[in-house]
């Protein structure tokens, strides 16, 4: 694990203790994301629609004043999944952020739509009801995610 990754994990752990996570402007994570893409930074939100199926939308992440305040969280967990691991249709166990730190995955939602996620990708997973989604680890590497459960599980 690189020093930058350890520093990022530490920052999220401190945020979990405080009850929320902030990403300060000017950190290597933000600078790299904006410099390489030349477009705004987004997170993917998975949610259950009125049809009881999971849908996705891209939500822009603006940094007013250099800091993006996320929804309050309760704790943090690191999860490891082996290459080729597939979790068939499943609902999220709770409303949470899922941040891919290492490896790649493909998320499948309603209508066969596939979302590719890799290192640095942020998902806000809220499909706690309905059919759910499929998660498939792709490529030769393990996938490590940081899962941050939201304090408010009501979704209101």
What label would you give each PLM region?
Residues 8-27:
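Bacterial N-terminal signal peptides
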Residues 21-80:
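A short, N-terminal "cap"/entry segment at the start of jelly-roll beta-barrel domains
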Residues 86-87, 104-108, 122, 153:
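Short beta-strand segments in beta-sandwich/barrel cores
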Residues 60-64, 74-92, 127-129, 152:
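Conserved short histidine dyad/triad with adjacent acidic residue
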Residues 111-129:
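Short acidic-glycine-tyrosine-enriched beta hairpin
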Residues 124-125, 139-155:
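A short hydrophobic beta-strand segment most commonly corresponding to one strand
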Residues 89, 107-108, 125-126, 131-139:
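Short beta-strand His + acidic residue motifs that chelate non-heme Fe in jelly-roll/DSBH
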Residues 91-107:
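Short, conserved beta-strand element in jelly-roll/cupin
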């Amino acid at each position: 694990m690189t020093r930058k990754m350890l520093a990022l994990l530490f920052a999220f752990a401190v945020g979990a203790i405080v009850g929320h996570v902030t990403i300060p402007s000017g950190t290597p994570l933000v600078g790299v994301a904006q410099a390489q893409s030349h477009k705004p930074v987004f997170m993917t939100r998975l949610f259950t629609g009125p049809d009881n199926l999971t849908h996705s939308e891209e939500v822009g992440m603006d940094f007013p004043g250099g800091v993006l305040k996320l929804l309050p969280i309760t704790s943090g967990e690191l999860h490891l999944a082996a290459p080729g691991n597939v979790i068939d249709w499943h609902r999220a166990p709770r409303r949470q952020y899922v941040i891919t730190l290492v490896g790649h995955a493909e998320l499948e939602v309603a209508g066969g739509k596939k979302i590719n996620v890799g290192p640095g990708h942020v998902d806000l997973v809220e499909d706690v009801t309905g059919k759910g989604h499929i998660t498939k680890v792709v490529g030769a590497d393990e996938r490590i995610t940081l899962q941050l459960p939201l304090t408010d599980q009501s979704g209101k």
